[in-house]
Swiss-Prot record:
Probable methyltransferase required to silence rDNA. This is Ribosomal RNA-processing protein 8. It holds the Pfam family Methyltransf_8. Residues 1-109 are annotated as: Disordered. InterPro entries: RRP8, RRP8_N, SAM-dependent_MTases_sf. It comes from Caenorhabditis briggsae. GO terms for cellular component: chromatin silencing complex; nucleolus; rDNA heterochromatin. It is found in: Nucleus, Nucleolus. Signal peptide: none annotated. The lineage of its organism: Eukaryota, Metazoa, Ecdysozoa, Nematoda, Chromadorea. S-adenosyl-L-methionine binds at residues 158, 193, 213, 225-226, 242.
Length: 332
């Protein structure tokens, strides 16, 4: 009956406005009666059902657990050992002391190293860089006082320096030793900043060698500040600075070297090439302090060697140009 009436209404095109209003009113009333309408959702019912389901599931779990504790038989000793066998042996815990790292030495052979020892090496290398920076950025007297209080720091520095030297393709010290070996006459040689006194070890029988450094690492070394040498005026034929012009008071070192040298004596300097701001200005500055340049040459791409002869005339005590950049190692 409802469909018939809808069809009749749809065919009445062009009907007057009053008739249309009646039709719309009838359609609204029919929709209210329930034809073609959806039921309203009741979300609170679903919530209640979910809570009830959860509660029931929890109760079932409690019941099941109680039953299992009552009915489960106790395992015998034999069954327990069988279970252990099935599990297999326990994995050994990782012990860093026992672990070893394979590395290649200088000969190319694989060498096993303990990671703890490796970590200690890295710490020592870091402290060496710190000490190295300190030596290049303080005066000689400050460095002397520092190492006097902490002898272990000096030992650590020299170990680190020895490790660095192993990586160098050449060392100016070898050139100086060859030069001294070629000297026919016996010379009084002062090795300033000597380290382990390698010059005294190599040519000590041929020449009279006095080795000076901030700390005496062996019997051949005299401990002192290089700007205050325990020696008389004009007592040396040769004064050597091999990679040892490290303090900020370079003028004091050169002045002291001139004091202990006899007139005509040789001041020999071996230094890293990259430290020089200007090689020409460096030589001119030393010449003004009472020397003349007799030899200047580059040993390799890394090192320079200078020979100066002491003369009587001193033009300036603190000339311009006597400057060296600090030789700092890159941080890793």
């Amino acid at each position: 009956m409802g469909k018939k009436r809808i069809n009749e209404v749809s065919t009445t095109e062009g009907a007057p406005a009053e008739k249309k209003k009646k039709v719309e009113k009838w359609l609204n009333t029919s929709s209210e009666d329930g034809e073609g309408t959806k039921k309203k959702k009741r979300p609170w019912r679903n919530k209640v059902r979910k809570l009830a389901a959860k509660k029931a599931a929890a109760e079932r779990r409690v019941e099941n657990s109680e039953e299992s504790t009552i009915l489960e038989p106790v395992a015998t000793a034999e069954e327990a050992t069988k279970k252990k066998k099935k599990r297999g042996p326990k994995k050994k815990k990782y012990k860093p002391e026992a672990a070893e790292v394979e590395k290649k030495n200088e000969e190319g052979d694989t060498v096993k190293e303990n990671p703890i020892a490796e970590a200690k090496k890295r710490l020592d290398a870091g402290r060496f860089r710190m000490l190295n920076e300190k030596l290049y950025t303080c005066t000689g007297s400050e460095a002397f006082d520092f190492f006097k209080e902490d002898r272990t720091a000096f030992d650590l520095y020299h170990r680190g320096f020895a490790d660095q030297v192993k990586k160098w393709p050449n060392h100016p010290l070898r050139e100086i030793i060859r030069w001294l070996q070629a000297k026919p006459d016996k010379q009084a040689v002062f090795d300033l900043g000597c380290g382990e006194a390698k010059i005294a070890e190599a040519v000590g029988e041929k020449h009279t060698i006095r080795s000076f450094d901030l700390v005496a690492v062996n019997d051949r070394v005299e401990s002192c500040d290089m700007s205050k040498l325990p020696a008389e005026d004009g007592s040396a034929d040769v004064v050597i600075f091999c990679l040892s012009l490290m303090g900020t008071n370079l003028y004091d070192f050169i002045k002291e070297a001139r004091r202990v040298l006899r007139t005509g004596g040789v001041l020999k300097i071996g230094e890293v090439t990259s430290r020089f701001v200007s090689i020409k200005q460096f030589c001119e500055a030393i010449n003004k302090m009472g020397f003349e340049t007799t030899n200047r040459r580059q040993l390799t791409d890394y090192f320079m060697m200078f020979d100066f002869r002491k003369i009587d005339k001193v033009e300036q005590k603190r000339p311009y140009g006597l400057k060296l950049k600090p030789c700092l190692y890159k941080k890793r």
